[in-house]
């Protein structure tokens, strides 16, 4: 996912700046991706078209990266295998990027169903490895980050809630308690 899915989420000034640059350059800009960028927005909007009453929309992604061979993405980018201290130092750019993507998805859905986003709450949980293990991208040492669970909750007008959740695990054994999606019992 590259961003620019719904630039309006960052305010009218940001949107106007992008629109002016596109006009000036004689181009258009279309951000896309899998989630967010397609699944996190298109499926909920399609499903709401078949709904009579909506109070809560939950989109939950769960990805396991043990077979993904890119050290640059899994370890350097997502910070799997980093200590909590390293994460605190290195995570600002990663968290800002992810947060921007998932907030755009919330704002896009909200506009699609005709409600206003009042605020977005963010929640992050990190789980460390209980033992050393290897994944395709490299080593995950005991005590380093092995799973991440992020949740963005968009509190909207008309008492509607839009939740985007992303669960990233370095292995199937990392945070097995997160196998059930948020809000589903």
Task: State each model region's role.
Residues 1, 29-32, 58-59:
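General beta-strand structural signal in soluble alpha/beta enzymes
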Residues 2-5, 34-35, 62:
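Short, ordered loop/turn segments at secondary-structure junctions
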Residues 2-28:
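Rossmann-fold NAD(P)-binding glycine/threonine-rich loop
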Residues 5-7, 38-39, 126:
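Short secondary-structure capping/turn micro-motifs that flank functional sites
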Residues 7, 32-35, 94, 98:
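Glycine- and other small-residue-rich loops at beta-strand/loop junctions that grip anionic moieties
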Residues 15-19, 44-47, 106:
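Short amphipathic alpha-helical segments and helix-helix/interface helices
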Residues 38-50:
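Alpha-helical support elements that line or immediately flank enzyme active sites
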Residues 48-184:
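Active-site-lining helix/loop region of Rossmann-like oxidoreductase modules
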């Amino acid at each position: 996912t590259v961003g620019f899915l719904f630039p309006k989420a960052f305010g009218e000034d940001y949107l106007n700046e992008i629109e002016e640059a596109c006009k000036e350059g004689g181009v258009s800009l279309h951000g896309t991706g899998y989630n967010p960028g397609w699944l996190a927005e298109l499926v909920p909007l399609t499903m709401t078209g078949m709904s009579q009453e909506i109070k809560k929309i939950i989109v939950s992604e769960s990805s396991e990266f043990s077979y993904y061979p890119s050290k640059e993405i899994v370890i350097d980018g997502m910070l799997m295998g980093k200590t909590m201290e390293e994460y605190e130092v290195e995570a600002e750019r990663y968290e800002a990027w992810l947060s921007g993507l998932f907030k755009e998805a919330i704002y896009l859905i909200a506009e699609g169903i005709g409600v206003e986003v009042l605020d977005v709450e963010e929640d992050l949980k990190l789980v460390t490895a209980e033992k050393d293990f290897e994944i395709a991208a490299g080593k995950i040492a005991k005590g380093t980050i092995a799973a991440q669970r992020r949740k963005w909750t968009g509190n909207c007008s008309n008492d509607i809630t839009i939740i985007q959740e992303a669960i990233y695990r370095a292995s199937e054994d990392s945070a097995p308690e997160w196998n059930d999606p948020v809000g589903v019992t």
